[in-house]
Curated annotation (Swiss-Prot):
GO BP: ribosomal small subunit biogenesis; rRNA processing
GO MF annotations in UniProt: ribosome binding
Protein name (record): Ribosome maturation factor RimM
Keyword terms, alphabetized: Chaperone, Cytoplasm, Ribosome biogenesis, rRNA processing
Function of the protein: An accessory protein needed during the final step in the assembly of 30S ribosomal subunit, possibly for assembly of the head region. Essential for efficient processing of 16S rRNA. May be needed both before and after RbfA during the maturation of 16S rRNA. It has affinity for free ribosomal 30S subunits but not for 70S ribosomes.
SUPFAM superfamilies: PRC-barrel domain, Translation proteins
Length: 189
């Protein structure tokens, strides 16, 4: 049983394919057929899966794992999410302006005046472009576009995103920015 310290979601199993124990899976990698190149995949309940074969189809990959030899065993994996340890992702292949979604989660979103708009709690792609989910203390989560106009700078070492709250849709009017500033004037008693 393996417990991952910094898990990164790589695929979700969708169901059995055929009679030999193969499964259909949605891969969350740039190259879906490279799913097995990252080493063993792990479930959150501690199981480990070694990819023996993988082939691409139109919307999913068909995967055969060691030890999953029949349809019943494959069906038992339906809906299972598979992860790898963050350290297994190849950082040297990233360009300066490329990031893994997993590295963005936990960053604090701030504007140029230092006001905080929350922490990145998720990164989503619903088809029209990537979105960042921000959650602040006592606030409901909000989604902002992950675009050059909204996210001006990413500093992984400092743990921050520099955002433009107007472009991100967090405020409708530039004058509203003053209510988010870090140094709010205190009310007189």
């Amino acid at each position: 049983m393996t417990k991952l310290e910094n898990p990164v979601l790589m695929a979700t199993i969708g169901g059995a394919q055929g009679l030999r124990g193969e499964v259909r899976a949605k891969a969350y990698t740039a190259d879906p057929s490279a799913l097995g190149d990252y080493g063993h995949l792990h479930s959150m309940d501690g199981r480990s899966f070694e990819v023996l074969e993988i082939r691409e189809t139109k919307n999913v990959v068909i995967v055969r794992f060691r030890g999953v030899n029949d349809r019943n065993a494959a069906e038992a994996l339906n809906g299972l999410e598979l992860y790898i340890e963050r350290d297994n992702l190849p950082d040297e292949e990233l360009e300066d302006d490329e990031f893994y979604y997993a590295d963005l989660e936990g960053l604090e979103a701030r504007d140029d005046k230092g006001a905080s708009y929350g922490t990145v709690t998720g990164v989503f792609d619903f088809g029209a472009g990537d979105l960042l989910e921000l959650k602040g203390p006592g606030k409901r989560p909000v989604l902002i576009p992950f675009s050059e106009a909204s996210v001006l700078e990413i500093d992984l070492e400092a743990g921050t995103l520099l955002i433009d709250p107007l472009a991100a849709g967090l405020v409708d009017d530039p004058e509203e920015l003053s209510k988010f500033t870090a140094d709010k004037p205190k009310k007189k008693k």
